[in-house]
Amino acid sequence: SIDLLNTITDAAIVPDKMLLSIQDLTNFLDTIEPSLIILQNITFANAAYASEVLKRFSCPVLLWTLREPVIDGGRLRLNSLTGAYSAGNALAAFRDGNFEYIFGAPQEERTKKTISACIRAAWLKNELKNLRIASVGHTPQGFGFGRAMDADMQKVFGATLESIEVRELIDMAKGYTDDECSEYLDKMTKCTVGLDKTPDNNRKDFARLCKAYKEYVDENNIGALSSRCWPDFFTAFGTPVCGVLAMLNDMGVAASCEADT
């Protein structure tokens, strides 16, 4: 089992020995701060072990039951599966059934795929705790389905949601000169077919908007952004923000229109 984990990730922390008492378990738990717990019953164990883990940590849990080899000899098996029933009941009580489960030996491909998927998902969830999301303006009428609440984003993903008014970025854009924005205009010209047919003032305004958004993203460490577009950028600025959001996506910043967070 340990060899399998080490082939999947270099971040696995495992005990030096089997944890055969609650004291052994608590001593080990004192040394870790996990983003994912893989709880494996090597033999029969009651729910006290799983309960001790669950009351300490809120991270995702994968319950792993070993498929035991069949050996003729009349002896009882180690009952890993029996122990999983106890642990599963504790998980259902603590997490309302919200946990992952795999029944299989370390050599089975299905076991490896399930554990790999759980580790990747846990890594992503942990990374999202460092994500800052920006909502530029509010969703227009009819687009409320895309509106996000900061408390919900924090609760579900651990991400921080901040808001800024559209006019603030428009005012930033209006304050730039053509020379200050030439870099962004050059980039857009190279990657947009037919940009030369766009009115000159719209192309320059796009470059101003692109600079304003990029500087806001960089200064505030924004990893994802949604922006109101219609009608503000048409009426107050004269140029839509759609092209800017496309450029942000190309730069590695997830961006969407109509403040669809």
Residue ranges and their predicted role:
Residues S1-G88, D96-K125, N130-A134, T139-A224:
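Metallocofactor- and cofactor-centric catalytic cores in central/energy metabolism, strongly enriched
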Residues M188, P231-T261:
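Active-site loop ensemble at the mouth of alpha/beta enzyme cores that anchors a bound cofactor
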Residues E215-V241:
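Hard-cation-handling environments
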